[in-house]
Every structure is written in C-alpha cells, then in structure tokens.
Amino acid sequence: MSEFLLEIGSGELPFHEVSAFPPRLAESFKTFCANELDFKDDENKNAEYYSTSRRVVLLVKNMPLKTEDKEAEIIGPPLKVCYMPDGSPAAPLIQFIKKNNIKNDKKIYAVSQKKGEYAAYKTIIKGRNAEKILSENIPAIIKKLQFKKSMHWSNADVRYPRPILWILALFDGKIVRFNYGDCKAGNYSYISRKDSFLKSFVKIENINDYIEKLKKAGIILNNLDRKNFIEKELINNAKKIECIFEDDSNLINEIVGITENPHIVQGQFDKKFLHIPHELLSLVMKKHQRFFPLFAKENSKLMPYFIGVANITSNLQHDETRDNNISRGYSRVLAARLNDADFFYKEDVKKSIEYFIDKTKDVVFYKGLGTYYEKTERLKQLAPYIFENIFGNKKAVSSAVSSINTQNKSETESANIKNKKIIERCISLLKFDLTTHVVYEFPELQGVIGKIYANKFGESEIVARAIEEHYYPTMKHGKKLMPADKFGDISAISDKFDTVLSFVMLNKLPTGESDPFAIRRAMIGLIEILLEKQYSISLNKIFDFYFNNFYKDKSLDLINLKDIFILFAKTRFKNIMISLNYNFDEISSVADDIFFDEIYTSYLKIDFVSKNKLHEYMYDLTFVFKRLNNITFNSGSIVFFDREKLILKEEIFLIKSYEFIKNESHRYIKLNNYYKLMNLYHEIVHPVNKFFDNVMVNVDELDLRNSRIGLLNSILLELKNLCDFSKLSY
C-alpha cells in the first residue's frame, strides 16, 4: 500500500471558505476513488482532509499502488454474419479478431443479447498505476470543488477563491506530475512567512516529513485543533491580568479561518475611551479589528485591554520584543478607530431624540414604501391593534404591567391607558437611532444604540429595551434572544408585520435563495415570537386591518395579495415545524387547511396530533373522515341540507349527533383543549358508520342526494377544526 499527499497553496482564503473545504474535498476525492481506483474509504480511515487560510491538504495512507486486473467481456458482431457457409470466419469476425488482438479464435463464444446472438470474447484488462490515474484526474477534482465566490487569475480556464501559488503532490515520495492552470505540481511547500515567497519553499519527502516541518513552523492544520488552541490561549492570557473574555463563537471561528500560525498578543487602549458605550467599544474591537475585549473577572466591567491573534511563523520561543511591537501596532490602529467612534458618539449626544426622529423623514425605507418616519406612523396604528388582539381580555391586560391590579373596572381602564401610552412611546422611538452618526458608521448597532441613547435622554427602561428588542429574535453567543416583555414583543411583531405586508403589497417577496431585504427572516422571527410567547393572533385580521388603513390610494388585488401572504407565512411555519421534528403528515393535516390562520393555535394542533395520532379515537376519526371524504370528494362545497328530506332514522340520528358536537365544540376550540375536542368528535363515529351501512347517498333524486352530501360535508368541515384527518399516514 502507498501514500498520497496533496497540498494546494494559495493566497489568503476567505475565512468562511476555510471550514467548508475539507468536506467538499472529501466528497470529491471519495467519488474519484470509488469510480477510478476501486478504493473505498467510507469510514474515512485512510484519508484526512485539512485546510488553513493558505493551504488545503489531502493526506491518504494505505492507498493501492495500482488498480486490480479486471476480466471484461467484449461483444462482437452478430453471430449470423460471423461465419461463411463452410464454417470459416467471415470478414466481420476476422475484423473483430484483429481489432482485439485475439490470439486464439477458439475462445470466441456466442452470447445472447436483446437483438439475438452475438460473438463475444473475454479478456483481461490490466490494472493501471495509481500515480498515473492521479495525475490525470487531480486537476478535474480541483476544478469540481464548489465555492461561494471564485476568481480567474490567469488565462487558463480555472477558478479558485484566490490565486493558486503552488501545488504539492507526492505519491510514495514521487512527484505526481500535472498542471492546474499555470501552476505545475511539485515536491515543494511554502511554509515560512518570514522570508520572501521565492526564498521560503521547503522540499517535502513524504507525509511524515510534511507534518514534521509544518509542526516545526507552528502551523496547525486541523481547524478544530486550531480552534481549541486559540480558546485555550485566550483563557490563559486573560487570566494573567485577572480578566475574562466574552465567548464569541462567530469571532473565534473567523479567527480560525484566517490563521494557520495563531499567536496570542495582548494590547491595551487609553482609559479615556471607557466613557464610550461599551457595546460600541466591543464592536470596534471585534468587528473592525478582530480583537477580543477583556472584562474584569469580579464584576464583568469592560477593561482597557484586549487580545489579538496574530498569524505569524512561530519559533516556538517567546519573543518579547516581537510581541511588544505587534501589541503597539495593534493599539495604534485601535486608537484611530476609537477616536472616530468617540467623535461620532459625542456629536450624537449633543442632539435630542426629537431631532433624530425628525431626520427619519429623510431616510427612505424602500422605494414605494415611504420613509422610516412614515413606517413609524403606520406602526402607531398597527401596534395598538395587535396589542388589543393579543391582550384584549382582562387577564392578559393585567399581566402586561405586573404592578397594576385590575380587580375593578377603573383600575383596568387605568392599566389600558398606561399600556397604550407605553406602546405609543416605544413605537415613536423604534427607528430614531437610524439617523445617528454611530449607527450610520456602525450599522450593526441599530437598536443597541437606540436603547443606550434612550436611557441617556431619560426614557424609561421599558421603552429603551423595546427599541433594542424590536430587532429580536437574534442569535448571540449561540443563544437565541427573545424580547423580555410584552412591549418588546408588540414592537417586534408590529415592525415585522409592517415589513412583510409592505413587500407583499409591492409583490416583492423573496424567491429562491435570495432574500436581500430580509423578508423571510422577518416572517420567521415573527412566527418564533408568537410560538415562544404563546400568542394567538389572526393573520387574516391583521391583513384586513393593515390594508383597510394603509395604501388605500393604490389599486390592489387584495384577495390575491392575501393568498400570497398566507402562503408565505404558512411555508415559513411549516419549515419551522419540520425543524422541530414533527412529521410531514402531521404538519400538513393542520397547516394545509384552507382556514389556516393562527400560528400558535396551529402549532398546538400539530403538537396534539403528533402526540395522539396513535390514540384509538384518532384511528376511528381518521377512518370515518376518509370514508366521508371519499363520498363527497367530487361534490363541490355543498354544506346545506334540508332536514325535511332527511327522514330516515339513521339520518335523524346523524343530524342530532352533528348538531350536538357543533354546539359543544366551540368552548373546547376556544380553550385549545384538543383532547376533549377529540373525545367529543369521537361521538360522531358510530352515527356516521350506521348511516353508511344503511343509507345510499348517491340516489337519483337530486335534492335528496344534495341534502345528504351537504350533511356529510358539514360534518367534514366541523372535524377539520381539529385537523384534516385525510392527510394522516399510518
């Protein structure tokens, strides 16, 4: 068995491509091995795939030296034209013998094919040298790799995320010769970063030699090993000055992707900058300089220190002079950025909130949707309506402000007035920070700066928090953050409804993978809040309210737009349900109903169906539902029935049973008590079966037939309040 080493060296790769390379290369190389070498590596025991910011590496051990010999059957001409009348070979057979260099024509035999019998001959195909196969196929393997973005850098028809500078390819220590573009494979690797590119090539003998030389240079090939090393060094260096660092997986993963020789360097900045909001300081350090801010271990207060990760060749010895030079350089660059942030912050706080609100009149939300000021005006009407729909009962209103006791009517009215004032103030300030200098320069801080400035300008904590949280849900350090209270909820829900419905009006909902205006994300966030906070609200009511109050000057096909909106919401909802591991049939039985409306209610139904699908009553209801559906399937939507025509005892029994469950079901539906609803609906099973056993539905008399179908359709419609049982699979 042999070994194969491939290293593709390039310019600095985008960090997001580094972690994606190993699985892509693994898939491509495994396919090649299976197809060309008959060498399967399903368990990944022989091949290893690595990547850093400058190199992509494939190491294969226990690889076959050559492919095995194979027996192959060669099909010749039809047997009927192979021989002359005297039995001697005819011209077609002679040509077949010459073409395949057959020495002994007695080994030719007949084989049956679809079109008759043919001459055939078995031969041995000699195995090929694996090195030769590799040299022929490696360029194609590289070319098949998929990237988010790639580039041309020579006249050759090749693409790669960055220009390829060298290719190392060895099979048992020998060069596997091939060209990729204008780069020729050899036995050299570029390791050191101290010298010029041309002077720092190192000759490689084999895999062990390669690994040893990388290790000596401090290069960590494995992404996970590099990540663990960086995290460990961050913790140790922070401890030295009694600090901790904020665990930011996104930043760490980015650092892993841009380094191969990670080296930790501490730095510090002037304490005068600590008056700047710490969120702004942290953003400048993390997003713009890729530094890790440090916090006091005892109280988590931001300290004037940071840690940077340099990508330098290590001599495995501590070089204090070098580290000091790097640290001073880091501090100098950071100081320039912090001076900018300090200037923007000081300019902002000279103004008032009203100044920034007025400036939103000049910021366009989107062409055809007005400015952010106009968006805010829409939200001022929409938010109270949503609040009333969600918290319209006394119990909900009293929970909106926990300090208010609503035992009597006057206190309830007082609570409502206070809630509405808070909502109005929250909505008025949601977008003011978009016009600040800081958010203009650091757009990632929208909402965060709004909260900070609102507090500074004397707004209540509830209002300030809602400004930040109306952008929620959002991920932070691997955790999903939701609004903390109902005012944040209403602010987020209202803003997202307005965004989605505005783009519905423009007929600009995202298609395919593209979502440039984050409409899909807004709908998903809206659904997640409704599910997390257990809010029931009618999508149809929101749509109707919205277009009855806004965009009335436009000629709109509201029926079509509503269908588009409901389908868009339903698709996002179904995807979320799938991510929660509900079965597709369970989801479809609820979400595919034409009356799909309330997100949280639909979730409760799906959850109930999932947990009770195997219940005996659900079996019975499914059987009855499908029986009803089979009879009425082609009858249209008739739901009217004439009681005077339905006089058979089975019909009378079924009508009474239907009217009983219809009258009783409303209270269980209102309480979302689907277990009792199932028990109630089960009472219709026996009457339906008795009806089908004794009554013919499709009789010749049209009025009688339609009345019976109308009764059955009415029962189907009632049962759909639980789910569409016909969608369930057993």
Language-model region placement:
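Amphipathic alpha-helical "coupling" segments that flank catalytic cores
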Residues: 1-397, 405-730
